[in-house]
C-alpha cells in the first residue's frame, strides 16, 4: 500500500506511521502542501493522508487541486486535524473526503484504511510478474 502523508507535525507523523504499521505501507512523507501537491501529480497513491494547517498550500487547497488536476483524482483522502468542526466537515464533504479524524483519535485510522482503501497494483510490477514480456 502506497501512502502519501502530508503533515508538518513530527509527533503526528510518527503516530500515523505507528498506527498504520500493521498495513505494511510504503509511506512518502512531505511537510508542505506544495510538496504534497507536486508529488501527487507524478506518482499514484492508494490513499492520501493530510493535515489542514500546512505551509504554502493548505490541506484543503491540496485536496481541491488533487481532485481537479492529478493522477490521484479518485484516490481516497483522509484529513487529520486538531479539531473536526462544522466548517471542516462541510469542506471535507465538498471535496469527497473519505474520513476526517481529530489527531487525538488516530488509533481508528488503521481500521478506516484497511476496510475502505483498495490497493491497486503498480502497473509496471504486474507487467513484470505476468510473464507477458521477456526479460
PLM features per residue range, with description:
Residues 1-11, 16-20, 48, 78:
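Conserved acidic segment of CheY-like receiver
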Residues 61, 81-101, 107, 111:
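Alpha4 helix (beta4-alpha4-beta5 surface) of REC/receiver domains from two-component response regulators
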Residues 121-135:
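CheY-like receiver
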Amino acid at each position: 500500500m502506497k501512502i502519501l502523508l502530508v503533515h508538518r507535525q513530527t509527533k503526528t507523523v510518527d503516530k500515523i506511521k505507528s498506527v498504520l504499521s500493521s498495513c505494511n505501507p510504503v509511506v512518502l512523507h512531505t511537510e508542505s502542501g506544495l510538496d504534497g501537491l507536486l508529488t501527487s501529480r507524478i506518482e499514484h497513491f492508494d490513499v492520501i493522508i493530510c493535515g489542514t494547517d500546512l505551509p504554502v498550500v493548505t490541506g484543503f487547497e491540496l485536496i481541491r487541486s488533487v481532485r481537479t488536476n492529478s493522477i490521484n483524482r479518485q484516490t481516497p483522502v483522509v484529513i487529520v486535524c486538531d479539531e473536526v468542526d462544522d466548517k471542516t466537515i462541510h469542506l471535507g464533504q465538498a471535496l469527497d473526503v473519505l474520513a476526517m479524524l481529530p489527531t487525538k483519535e488516530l488509533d481508528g485510522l488503521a481500521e478506516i484504511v484497511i476496510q475502505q482503501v483498495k490497493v491497486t497494483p503498480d502497473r509496471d510490477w504486474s507487467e513484470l510478474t505476468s510473464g507477458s514480456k521477456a526479460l
